[in-house]
Amino acid sequence: MGIKNLKSLLLENKSLTILDDNLYKVYNGIFVDTMSIYIAVANCVRNLEELTTVFIKYVNGWVKKGGHVTLFIDRGSIKIKQDVRDKRRKYSKLTKDRKMLELEKCTSEIQNVTGFMEEEIKAEMQLKIDKLTFQIYLSDYDNIKISLNEILTHFNNNENVTLFYCDERDAEFVMCLEAKTQFSTTGEWPLIISTDQDTMLFASADNHPKMIKNLTQLFKFVPSAEDNYLAKLTALVNGCDFFPGLYGASITPNNLNKIQLFSDFTIDNIVTSLAIKNYYRKTNSTVDVRNIVTFINDYANLDDVYSYIPPCQCTVQEFIFSALDEKWNEFKSSYLESVPLPCQLMYALEPRKEIDVSEVKTLSSYIDFENTKSDIDVIKSISSIFGYSNENCNTIVFGIYKDNLLLSINNSFYFNDSLLITNTKSDNIINIGY
């Protein structure tokens, strides 16, 4: 659930570490994302009675460790999650259909078991049948809500357990918002229990240490500004509950070491992070990049986004080139596109030194509107006359690639309105910088 790969990415980035749960006995209160834990428990048991027993046992165990447990419970409909709900219903139906076929197969096979260890084999198959039957029952969301509400009645008179209903808001969102409020008065986050990876996005908003737990593991999370950036970038690229992500891109532990991380979640920094490969513009479609980035920022910062209209999915190419269009169009307004490249370069470069008369004559000799082929030596000569270098540049201003004049950002990549070339794959590019 939540943001794909975020937990593994934070583990890879060393801000999230796994601890021995047995070494930590006492917490300053415990906050639980109830539905995520309830579903996790339900997937491990065979019937409602067992689910009730196991869930209550978990809560009582948390009371012993935290003194007080707050169960955050989803309630009501969240309008901006309609698309997510529709997709989950579709996925749930496919899963239910698959499990029903599996149940039919097991029910048929158990009738034909005979011979050696017949009773043991039948007992094992019956356990599987019971579990499949229960999972099919829980594939109906109404059954989930009814069974959860029934279990929660066991805590109505328990002074050590508070039921906190989150009306038209995600429980994990409200939980982390309340945890921040508690921190402001006590100086310590409660233990957060959830299987939803959005929780780690919300917990990355400040650099204070946090303890986060799922059913089987305990984590210590000490996020830096870079981790907060990584969490937001992962929500943007891989998607979260309210934004489907950038189609055609994914952040994984395998490519994390190629991605530049920053402290500030700005458009320039985001595009730099995405520029781990070359991209070509495939369509003329543009998207409102600022709106997407603002939404991810506000969501991660626990601002109330539930009244927003969530951004639509776009491709990674549409995002990148829409993000770069403003810079390219600003440059293009003072750029002679229809003349040969040497002339384009002379017009685009701002002199960084005095140009003497002999150099002016040299530049004049390069003006040839009939010659559309570019000479590398001419390009280097023009750069030198204007006070620029082609090697060992601390700041790259332009790149020349196949008669294309490209802009550079953060010395990390080159681009125009139709292509982006990463600096790690720039053997065929002539740098112009200083």
Curated annotation (Swiss-Prot):
For this protein, the record's CDD domains field holds: PIN_Pox_G5
The record describes how the cofactor is bound as:
Binds 2 magnesium ions per subunit. They probably participate in the reaction catalyzed by the enzyme.
Where in or outside the cell?
A: Virion
Enzyme Commission numbers on file: 3.1.-.-
A GO CC term? virion component
Per the record's keyword annotation, is Hydrolase included, yes or no? yes
Using the UniProt record, give the first listed, main subcellular location. Answer: virion
Keyword Transport found: no
A GO molecular function assigned to this protein is: metal ion binding
Outline what the protein does. Answer: Putative nuclease that seems to be required for double-strand break repair, homologous recombination, and production of full-length viral genomic DNA.
Give the protein name, as stated in the record.
Answer: Putative nuclease OPG089
Q: From what organism does this protein derive?
A: Monkeypox virus
